[in-house]
Amino acid sequence: MKNQVDLVRSYNDKDNVAHFLNSTLNKGQQKIVKDDLLTGKTKLLYVAPETMTKEENINFFKELEISFFAVDEAHCISEWGHDFRPEYRRLREMMDLIDETKPVIALTATATPKVQSDIVKNLGLRKPKIFISSYNRPNLYYEIQPKINLEQTNKSIVRFVQQHKNKSGI
C-alpha cells in the first residue's frame, strides 16, 4: 500500500492527498490519517481488509463522504484464488455497513473465470462490466538472462538496479 500511496503523492504537491490505513501504523500515525480524512484533505485512502473489519473503523468511515469502494487484488476474495484471505470475503458486509449505496469496482490481474464468478457473487455485483486484457502489454519488456553462478548473478542484478534507478524490474 505504501508504494501505491507514494506513487500517487509523486503526482501531487501535497503529501496528504493519499494515505493508507493498516496495522503497520501506530496510533499517532492513524490519527494524522483520520484527521486528514475528516478535513477533506485526503482524496484517496487505501485500507487493508483486516483494518476495515474493525468496528471502530467502520464507525469512522460512516462519517466520511465516500465516493466509491475499490477492491484491489480482488482475486483474494475467492477461496479458489491463489491468494485467498478470509477478511476479503467480509468486504461486502463492511461496505454495506458503511454505505450500501456507493458503487464498487473490483480489480485483479489474475482471475480465472471461476474466480471472477466468485468475486461477482461475493461482492454482490449486479450486471458488472468485466474488462479483460492480455498479459502481453506493449509497455512491458521481457528478457531472460542465464544464471551462470551466484556471484555473476548478483553482479548482474546490482548492475541492472544501478542502470535503472527509480524504475521497475524483476
State each model region's role.
Residues 25-68, 76-82:
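Conserved helix/coil segment N-terminal to the catalytic DExD/H
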